[in-house]
């Protein structure tokens, strides 16, 4: 079955270093869902400047909960009921589309790429940008489902291991935005440093300048119990997520040092 891709739109097509571009739903959704924060940009008519907020969110499908990352998914964003973005989303219509237009992005750093000259330095990274229209979720069943989805995106199974479901006050004070995605793109860099031919032929520079990649990843430390914690041991689901997550991110960072297959990724 062919891999689904987002359509290339003028606002979503990668122009510079476009050999690094990806439009695969699976790739883009994977980057978004692996990031602890999603940067959400919107325009408020009361301000001369676009607003950008770091938010917590996750891609999923209420209609098809078993859908995988390569399927068509919505982005669910979690926020306070009376925040500026939530208020705008309740009343916004744009060009016939229902909801407020949003641009959303996420980036994962995999390494520092150190070259012979400052101009050739880079990062190994995975970034994604999505464009869509957001409306508040009003159906209570979908809202509860989305709250569980977002909570478990922070720590898997955390929702089931807390007092749940949310009480009435919590439901009233929390809003969930559902973003229907119109387009998206990803940009990925992996591999070693690459320098200009002139610098590569400069033996003096090459003799004194270390070049290579410093892999980088998010590392979770040992959990520290809260002052009113009464659970003697760190729960197994939490420790498993921490240990396995650390190892997975470490593996990905070192994997990114390898040169990409020609024609697959830019450098």
Q: Model-found features: residue ranges?
A:
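A general structural signal for short secondary-structure junctions and capping/turn motifs
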Residues: 29-31, 67, 92-96, 167-171, ...
């Amino acid at each position: 079955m062919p891999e689904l891709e987002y359509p290339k739109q003028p606002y979503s097509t990668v122009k510079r270093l476009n050999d690094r571009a990806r439009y695969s739903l699976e790739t883009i959704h994977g980057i978004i869902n692996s990031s602890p924060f999603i940067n959400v940009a919107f325009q408020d008519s009361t301000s001369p400047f676009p607003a950008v907020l770091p938010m917590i969110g996750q891609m999923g499908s209420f209609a098809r909960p078993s859908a995988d990352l390569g399927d068509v998914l919505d982005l669910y964003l979690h926020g306070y009921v009376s925040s500026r973005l939530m208020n705008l989303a309740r009343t916004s219509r744009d060009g016939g589309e229902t909801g407020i237009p949003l641009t959303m992005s996420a980036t994962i750093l995999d390494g520092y790429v150190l070259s012979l000259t400052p101009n050739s330095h880079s990062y190994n990274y995975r970034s994604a940008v999505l464009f869509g229209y957001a409306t508040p979720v009003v159906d209570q069943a979908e809202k509860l489902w989305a709250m569980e989805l977002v909570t478990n995106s922070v720590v898997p199974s955390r929702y089931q291991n807390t007092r749940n479901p949310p009480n009435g006050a919590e439901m009233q004070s929390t809003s969930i935005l559902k973003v229907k995605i119109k387009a998206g793109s990803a940009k990925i860099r992996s591999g070693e440093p690459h320098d200009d031919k002139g610098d590569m032929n400069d033996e003096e520079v090459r003799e004194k300048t270390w070049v290579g990649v410093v892999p980088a990843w998010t590392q979770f430390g040992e959990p520290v119990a809260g002052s009113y914690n009464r659970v003697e041991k760190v729960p197994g689901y939490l420790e498993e997520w921490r240990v396995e997550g650390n190892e997975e991110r470490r593996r990905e960072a070192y994997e990114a040092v390898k040169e990409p297959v020609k024609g697959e990724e830019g450098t």
